[in-house]
Amino acid sequence: WRFSACSGHFGGSMDGAALGLVEAPKTWHVAEFKTHNAKSFKALIEKGVQASKPMHYSQMQIYMHLSGMVRAYYMAVNKDDDSLYAERIHYDQPHAEALLANAASIIKANEPPEGISTNAGWYECKWCDYHSLCFEQTLPEQNCRTCLHSTPAANGLWHCEATAQMGEPPYLSADDQKQGCSMHLFIPALIKGIAVDACPDGEWVEYEQDGKTIRNKAGGTWG
């Protein structure tokens, strides 16, 4: 039950498909099963899936869109007392298409999207695992996904312009992407500074940071 979109760069696996439900016995349903704590479960009962768990709702809309099904069945269990909640969800085509368009725009973007807040103390930022990347001078991991030479290609592949210019195979395996290489240069938007200069041969990019000039050299080194 796995589906993909956006040239193989976006996808997921739904939990299952259900047929024979009392409300619509002849209609196939995307089936999703989730666990909740007591607080989350209470909100789910009071507000429904779309309002209380918009990510779960969007997940089912994507699966309905990609599978061709027009209904989803959401089953939730309260892990504190094993009580159950079920809800049938109708397919919302505009919502699903908007989600896929947003995913495609992020995949194809040359820079990461803006953060949810510029306030380091904002609660969603404060507890985020990547807080230091947004609000401190911590560098991201050095791999192909953080390198300005790589771009998404068809069939879920990634293309390296640096290796292509050297006449080597340009498409990157999953292992290649995780490891990076000696030609790595960070995407400028990931650096806490202003890009002010770059080598025409792609060997370095210079930044101004706190009144100083620093140079990101190929391979992730600095000088």
Where are these regions (language model features)?
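Glycine-centered tight beta-turn/hairpin loop motif at sheet-sheet or coil-to-beta transitions
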Residues: 7-9, 26, 165
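Conserved catalytic cores of phosphodiester-cleaving nucleases, focusing on short active-site segments
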Residues: 12-47, 63
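Metal-dependent nuclease catalytic regions and adjoining charged, substrate-binding loops involved
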Residues: 43-57, 62-167, 175-223
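A short acidic/basic microdomain associated with nuclease active sites
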Residues: 1-9, 15
